[in-house]
């Protein structure tokens, strides 16, 4: 089974179990070293604690055992974790919540010969992101069509 199919099955199975105050941020499955790892990234307002991840792991693990036929080709480790400071912005809803925050955006196609922008997300209307970024020593604004975004994540401003 393809990795993307496994991720879709797992996401569909566990989403109902991850309820408020928690938010499912992402699901990843792949090899880390010699082992397969299923990573479930969750968050909540104010941040996620070690106890939260332990509780969610106990809730999610039995659900994964009910997926038939078993989508996992090999044994795997389950990791329930925080998305971290540089959490991915994989949906339009996640981008909307990031308005006012410092973000990193990679594009499929360059705008003014630039494919990577890092700056403050000023607004997002579902179609375009408007960002303020530094070009050497000058502040500039750029309008980025959402469909040209390859990857976006929160960023730490140094």
From Swiss-Prot:
Keywords: Cytoplasm, Ribosome biogenesis. It comes from the Bacteria. GO terms for biological process: ribosomal small subunit assembly; translation. One of its GO terms (cellular component) is cytosol. It is found in: Cytoplasm. The keyword Disulfide bond does not apply. Pfam families: DUF150_C, RimP_N. Its main location: cytoplasm. Belongs to the RimP family. Required for maturation of 30S ribosomal subunits. This is Ribosome maturation factor RimP. The gene is rimP.
């Amino acid at each position: 089974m393809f990795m993307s199919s496994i991720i879709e099955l797992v996401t569909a199975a566990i989403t109902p179990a991850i309820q408020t105050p928690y938010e499912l941020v992402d699901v990843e499955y792949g090899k880390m070293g010699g082992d397969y790892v299923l990573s479930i990234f969750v968050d909540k307002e104010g941040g996620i604690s070690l106890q939260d991840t332990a509780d969610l792991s106990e809730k999610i693990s039995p659900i994964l055992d009910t997926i038939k036929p078993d989508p996992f080709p090999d044994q795997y480790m389950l990791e329930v974790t925080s998305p971290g400071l540089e959490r991915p912005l994989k949906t339009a809803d996640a981008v909307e919540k990031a308005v006012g925050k410092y973000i990193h955006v990679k594009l499929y196609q360059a705008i003014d010969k630039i494919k990577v922008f890092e700056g403050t997300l000023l607004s997002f209307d579902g179609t375009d992101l408007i960002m303020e970024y530094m070009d050497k020593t000058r502040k500039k604004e750029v309008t980025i069509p959402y469909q040209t975004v390859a990857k976006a994540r929160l960023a730490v401003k140094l």
